[in-house]
A protein has these predicted regions:
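A structured phosphate/pyrophosphate-recognition subdomain
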Residues: 1-9, 20-27, 96-168
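Active-site cofactor/cluster-binding pocket
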Residues: 45-101
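Anionic-ligand anchoring segments at beta-strand to alpha-helix junctions in alpha/beta enzyme folds, i.e.
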Residues: 2-59
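A short, conserved beta-to-alpha structural element at the edge of catalytic cores
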Residues: 37-38, 93, 120-121
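Conserved strand-to-helix beginnings and helix N-cap segments that scaffold or border functional pockets
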Residues: 14-19, 73-75, 151
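General beta-strand structural signal in soluble alpha/beta enzymes
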Residues: 4, 34-36, 88-89, 126-128
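Short, glycine- and charge-enriched coil/turn segments that flank and shape catalytic ligand pockets
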Residues: 29-31, 76-77, 82, 121-125
Length: 168
């Protein structure tokens, strides 16, 4: 039972990562859901995140693109689960280290850039839907690849997502 936490006022990186990780874990037959303190903006509805409704007791809590506990928010029962985070997957160099384990790459332009590598390491195929979710994270956190945080690796990952069937 795995619960994926996103940050409040969700952007494309946190919800894209949450949805992509959800799909990857479902491919491994895991019981999984996503929780966000705030509603998912309509522009990200295509991610089809399976939102947590209390249907299981989480054994593992994973945060994606959340640099500190203050970013979780307090709605939808978030505080109950954000008190103990097992793993944080993040790209913010200033990550506070609140999780038991933190997978951090401060040179990544988006958490999606890092999560792409994680999903590959899990042995899960990058489906067109996972590619759409991860590409959304890349595109939104880089200002459509205009921000200075955009690197050659960001473009390499974007190209691999397009090859996997991302709908650009």
């Amino acid at each position: 039972n795995i619960l994926i936490l996103c940050h409040k006022n969700p952007d494309g990186d946190t919800i894209g990562c949450g949805s992509a990780l959800y799909c990857a874990l479902k491919a491994l037959d895991k019981n999984v859901a996503v929780l966000c303190s705030d509603a998912i903006p309509n522009r990200y509805a295509f991610t089809n995140a399976h939102m947590f409704k209390g249907e299981f007791e989480p054994q593992t809590v994973v945060a994606v693109d959340v640099a500190s506990v203050q970013l979780f928010g307090e709605n939808n029962g978030m505080t109950q689960f954000s008190r103990h985070v097992d793993l944080c997957i993040d790209h913010h160099a200033g990550n506070s280290g609140y999780a038991d384990f933190t997978l951090l790459n401060g040179s990544a332009a988006a958490a999606a850039e890092l999560l792409y590598e994680v999903i590959n390491a899990m042995g899960v195929a990058i489906t067109p839907h996972i590619a759409d979710c991860l590409y959304t994270g890349l595109a939104t956190d880089t200002g459509c690849f205009r921000f200075s945080s955009t690197t050659a690796n960001t473009h390499i990952v974007a190209a691999k997502l397009i090859e996997a069937g991302c709908h650009v």
